[in-house]
Amino acid sequence: MGVPPAGVVVAATKPHRRSICSPKNRFCSMALVTERVRYIGRKLKKVFRCESRVTQEKSSISDGERINSSNMKKRSSLHALRAVALTLPGLAQATDGDPSTFTFQYGRYEEGKRELFDTKNDEFDPIVVDSIFGNVSLNFLDRFKFSGNYTQDTWSGATPITTAPLQFMFDTPTGASSFAATNVFVDADFDPVDTSVFTPSGLLKDTQLVHMVTSASVETRKQGDFGLTYEWDEAAATVGGGLSSESDYESHFVNIGGSLDFNSKLTTVDFGMSYTWSDIDVNLDPRFDPYIDEGNHGDDVEISIVDGNRVTSVTGKRRDWSANLGLTQVLNKNALIESSIGYTRSSGFLENAYKVVGFLFVEPMPGMPFLSGNFDGVLEQRPDVRNQWVWDNRLVHYVEPLDASVHADYRLYHDDWGITAHTLELDWNQPLGRGWTVIPRVRYYSQNEADFYQPFFLFKQAKPLLTPGRPDIDFSQVPISEYSSDHRLSGFGTLSGGITIAKQIGDAVSLKAGFEYYTHQGGLKLGGGGEDDFADFDYWAANASLTVDLSAKFLPVLSSSSNDHFGLHRHRGHSGGHAPAGVMFSHMLPSAGDFMVGYRYMRSERHGDILHGTGSVSDATIISQGCGNVQCSFAPRQMIMNMHMLDIMYAPTDWLNLVLMPQFVDMEMDLRPLPGQSLDVGEHQHGGNSTHETGGVGDTGLYALIKLFETPGHHLHMALGGTAPTGDVAQTSIREEHPPLGAAGTVEEFVHYGMQNGSGTWDFRPSLTYTGQGGAFSWGGQLSGIIRLDHRNDSGFAFGDEFKSTLWTSYNLFSWLSASVRMVYTRQGEIRGEYDGPHSEIGPMDFPESYGGEYWDLGLGLSSMIPFSGFEGNRLAFEWIQPLNDDVNGFQLEREGSLIASWSISY
């Protein structure tokens, strides 16, 4: 499958490949079809195979990026063909039967530096996106399938907002003041000119263009969606929906679809429809707002005063209707072909509110060698309706002598904005034996520019003024009504190459890792005539994923029956029953060769009063005492932290377990201004946006669990290991300054200490765990600690050491369900050192002494061993942590509580 034009958002349900084979079908072993559903530019994919069908959905981290994945198992040439055919890009393996699966994927997208010609724009880091994706696909009641997905993208870095002649940039940090220039100079051909000592006139033509870029604080997008499918013998129907939310854009979507099989299931027809409704609410960058004319957007623009500052907001609504029709045909035992057409109609606010267009007004004066004009910035204006058509084609062919398959894709895209795009892609899927598969690929993409795109717009007329003596443009006198300088609507081509490596581990677990490198160039446009080379850049994308077949044969699980002495059989490593969800390293795998995969989620919240010691304090106390020698101007209103962690455990012996625990975090802090404080020069201004966000890869845990003692009903083991500093501790935010004279400015500085993604230090995290069980009761205790092995991290500080102790007991309510109660004591030291770079000191959260303390908590939990057929061996556990007492260092926001959920399965 190809990719749409960069910057083109296609909200469409796009089915592709589905085929279900009858037992009498001689091509059954290789027939295959996939449905692909695209929600707002993110790809959700489904795979079906002959004896059974499995759905696996995936979200790409960005338009134009896709990491292929595959899993194959060689049995015979026909079985190999089937497996090879199933290795479609981005999709998990379909296994025998009708399996339920769990998938977790991490992806990273990173752009290279752009050519900014030594302007101060070059100081900005390029775009980086960290993405996580989770999917659970469950089969139930024989013919039903449920698929749920969660996607999270965290963005940071600088992106172009417009294009301007280099000579208009004035070497400013963002280029914004280019639009404040009352006079710019062009020659008789209306080309920009530069000063020169080598020409008699002192001016020299210079047509070089350059991107204006701007950087923003970290932002996170979260999306959840679901699908429910019912299957008949020769048909299927699906309904689904979801929500995508970020700080300035929220979308809801629903879809319906179906498929019909004909010709002994050698032919499949797919069809579907979707509807998306979106709300846009953007606060314009205060660095650009004073220079940008928003008058062309009328009622979409609202100006308000927040915290004493002017805030310009752009709001709008968008609607997308989509329909599609697809056909899959099995040609012979070695090949199948797929083709589909899709249509999307988008209406409403289709602009990107962050994109600016340069208007150059020059009044012609015949006979003059040089002319002066005005260069003004306006918000882009796109058509209110967009009609889009897509035609996708794919050929899958099994190459029997090499036990491999080739996938060839072509996509044609066209819309009524004047963009036509072509995508060619070629994948080679090669099994290597022992569960290994390698998939190299190459992709070429080309599009022409939109009808209303130009790097900037030249008008051979005097600047039309709405009111004499004021700079506002009279847009009724501008000869065009639609215009954009968004480089994603320009003419360009991309060429990419990549590789995916997949490994099947037993019958239940598959691992994949992929990498793809892209080059984006105007010169690669089909037929030439693309954007000039100032817009060229490279980027890369990589991901890694783990997929677990939930219906595979797993280890026997802990029995909770009183008829089983101490509840012990093969899974004896769980002596003492299952600990609450929040207890790490609570058990060991019992036998050499055992393997466990788990997922853990934690959400913790802080809001309410500001505490000092054990009591709450007033705002007046915070102002006078919370920020050292200066007065505080802000205090935290709320902080939310989400953590996603994988638990991967392997037992090389019956007394030693090895554990890998990668984690991914995101945090959000909302601030409130303190009463009576001056928010003028040099203070921290949010311009209406008082929320900071961070997120990405956290620290990675590596541990060894060692069994010390075990008898029936009692078990003791210790954990030795710790975390590697893979989490970023250089997360920054943009501080806006509003001096009384001059334009708004910004400073990029370290975000509040508690919002960094990791510790930045190598941390030793030992623990000692005891568990026991008698009858329906089980109990346990754990001592654990964190010792920072580095005195400072790369940002100049180190979090305090930590000691924790916990005791719990649980009772079996049923043979499959237990309830637990837990007490937790934690002591954490304050931060050592401080940031060694720019950082705010506007509130208590910015001072190292306001971290750490002593905490008492109560945990209430439920743990279940799933009793349903097809899900045996799966454990689900939940625990709520309720704070009982806080004795904090410095001034800290009150803790509200934490929710912990975990899932695990062993085989």
Language-model features: where?
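Repeated loop/turn-to-beta-strand initiation elements of outer-membrane beta-barrel proteins
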Residues: 100, 144-146, 234-239, 265-269, ...
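Transmembrane beta-strands of outer-membrane beta-barrel pores
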Residues: 106-112, 152-156, 232-234, 241-247, ...
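Outer-membrane beta-barrel translocator domains and adjoining extracellular loop/strand segments
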Residues: 114-120, 159-165, 241-244, 249-257, ...
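Outer-membrane beta-barrel translocator/channel fold
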Residues: 115, 151-211, 215-224, 268-334, ...
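Extracellular loop and loop/strand-boundary signature of outer-membrane beta-barrel proteins
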Residues: 117-123, 210-214, 240-245, 255-259, ...
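Outer-membrane beta-barrel architecture
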Residues: 135-137, 225-227, 257-259, 322-326, ...
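Outer membrane beta-barrel transmembrane domains
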Residues: 194, 198-204, 340, 344-398, ...
